[in-house]
Amino acid sequence: MNALFAIAALVAAAVAADKSPESPSSVPSGTWPDGKKAAFYLSFDDGCPTQTTNVFPLLEKYRIPGTFYVCPGWDLFKKYESAWSNANEYVFLGNHTMTHGKIPDKAALDRELAGCNAVIARLRPKQKGPVSFAIPAAESMHKVLEITDEEIAETYKRHNLVERWLWHGYPVQCKTIPEMEAYVDKVIESGGVGHMDFHGVGGDWLDPGLEYFEALMKKLDSRRGEIWFATHIQIYERLKNRK
């Protein structure tokens, strides 16, 4: 799969020309609820089947939410649609376009985004508010099609989307369990926003292995008292509202 650099989101209105901004490494003291030192979110791209079988139960076990960026036009997604529809309360869906395919122009982009949003609304009707969006197979919308910053902002507003922060996860960063655990500690120390982004977990493509993911969940749980576990959208909205 070519979705390795599926990217990430706006906290401000500006859109980076070549690459989406990284998540904030630090924020003012008192930003996070309940005296938490840092925020952390999990995200999963492409709607891999192993996400439904391996990730869903672990999110529920550890009470940590995750956002899954799905491509509803894929036959593979349709095959497991009931699992997505009946997923537990820790599962949130994000927009990864309908097909993860070539987008030749702005009209095609609108169709891809609107179609994906419609499926998300149908499968998860209780999920309200803006929808998190991960650009498929690129680090910027400018690398997907010819489009201006203003047109990107207008498109996101029209479809009620918030772009995810720059991809961070295996196999680009945190290639080993010790590296991943050190990253979690660093996020807490800095007081910003941490996240780990995945594709397959225990199978499928770009898979770090189920042992790796279970180690991440145990590490996050061990520092639960210091971390606000939230979705990308929840973190985005908290930062936006505290400006």
Roles of regions detected by a PLM:
Residues 1-8:
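Sec-dependent signal peptide recognition
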Residues 44-47, 97, 200, 232:
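Active-site metal-binding loops of divalent metal-dependent hydrolases
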Residues 8-17:
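Hydrophobic h-region of N-terminal signal peptides that target proteins for export
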Residues 38-40, 60-148, 158-171, 195-204:
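Metal-dependent polysaccharide deacetylase catalytic core of the NodB/CE4 family, i.e.
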Residues 20-53:
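Boundary/entry segment of secreted carbohydrate-active catalytic domains
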Residues 39, 50, 54, 108-111, ...:
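Extracytoplasmic/secreted proteins, especially bacterial periplasmic and envelope-associated proteins
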Residues 173-185:
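A Trp-anchored, charged/polar loop motif used as the substrate-binding/catalytic surface
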